[in-house]
A protein has these predicted regions:
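A short beta-strand-loop micro-motif that forms or neighbors metal/cofactor-
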Residues: 28-43, 49, 84-85
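A short, surface-exposed loop/turn module that caps and links secondary-structure elements
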Residues: 40-69
Length: 103
């Protein structure tokens, strides 16, 4: 029987928290659900996680890569691994275009 992986600890960047507060309650619920899935399994299929192009992360823990994940058809959030091992830093969230512009 495979060992169950521990969930990642979450680190929230200021811009993530500011943009999260601007979302409608239903949008916040979608982000909440997606973040829970990410914490438990960053490869969860519905998150459609992929690397952001031409963006460097702040933390070397994850190889300086930044990732984009889907919370819904129109909502995205960005993250990277770090700042410490076993942590995920949530960088930004919101509607598709603005979120990916301000990675």
């Amino acid at each position: 029987m495979p060992a169950k992986l521990s969930p990642f600890e979450l680190h929230f960047e200021i811009i993530f928290l500011e943009n999260y507060a601007r979302l409608k309650p239903s949008e916040r619920n979608a982000i909440d659900k997606a973040v829970r899935l990410l914490s438990a399994n960053p490869r969860y299929p519905s998150l459609n996680v992929h690397k952001a192009r031409n963006v460097k992360g702040k933390y070397a823990e994850g190889g300086n890569d930044v990732f984009i994940a889907y919370a819904s058809k129109y909502l995205r959030f960005t993250f990277e691994y770090g700042p410490e091992p076993g942590m995920i830093a949530l960088r930004n969230c919101g509607h598709h275009e603005p979120c990916e512009r301000e990675i």
